[in-house]
Design a protein with these regions (language model features):
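Conserved beta-strand segments of alpha/beta enzyme cores
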Residues: 110-112
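C-terminal alpha-helix
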Residues: 133-141
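Flexible "cap/lid" loop of the alpha/beta hydrolase fold
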Residues: 1-15
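A short, basic/aromatic alpha-helical/loop segment that forms part
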Residues: 10, 94-95, 125
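Acidic/histidine metal-binding catalytic segments
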Residues: 26-41
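An amphipathic alpha-helix signature
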Residues: 13-21, 36
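Catalytic histidine-centered segment of alpha/beta-hydrolase-like enzymes
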Residues: 116-131
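Conserved serine/cysteine hydrolase catalytic core
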Residues: 43-106, 115
Length: 142
């Protein structure tokens, strides 16, 4: 992901809102107004142009993960036994496969699960499927 942790060359939120549908592959049927909200959430408009609103060091962590050998994560997941667990998956996610989500559900039949249609990784958390999963998760907390 060439854009992670970098300030865009775009100057305004309007430009970013127009560009986001082309950068955020896997997100379908997103209204222009939502792309504008996302642009305003992720970038601050300055006289020099847009600046990211998150730590740019995220880029190094993100890139190093691609170069590293994948660790076996199932023991970590299994260690959550007895704890409330929820998964909100974008149906078009290129990072969390349907097979992995199915295995998570097999291992934890009690896991709260939502799959958000027309969304990639990471889905918006204020859509009905996401909100229902978040509410269900919060209800299970002690």
């Amino acid at each position: 992901c060439a854009y992670v942790g970098r300030n865009p060359r775009l100057k305004t939120h309007e430009e970013a809102a127009a560009a986001l549908p082309h950068v955020m592959e896997g997100f379908a049927n997103v209204p222009e107004s939502r792309w504008r909200e996302e642009a305003e959430k992720h970038y601050v408009q300055t006289p020099e142009g847009l600046k990211i609103t998150y730590d740019p060091a995220l880029r190094e962590a993100f890139l190093s993960a691609f170069g590293a050998e994948l660790a076996e994560m199932w023991p970590c997941f299994d260690a959550l036994a007895g704890k409330p667990v929820a998964l909100i998956r974008g149906a078009n996610s290129e990072l969390l496969s349907p097979a992995t989500a199915a295995e998570m559900r097999r291992r934890r039949p009690d896991m709260i699960f939502a799959e958000v249609p027309d969304r990639a990784h990471i889905p918006f958390l204020d859509e009905p499927e996401s909100l229902a999963a978040i509410r269900a998760f919060l209800e299970r907390l002690p």
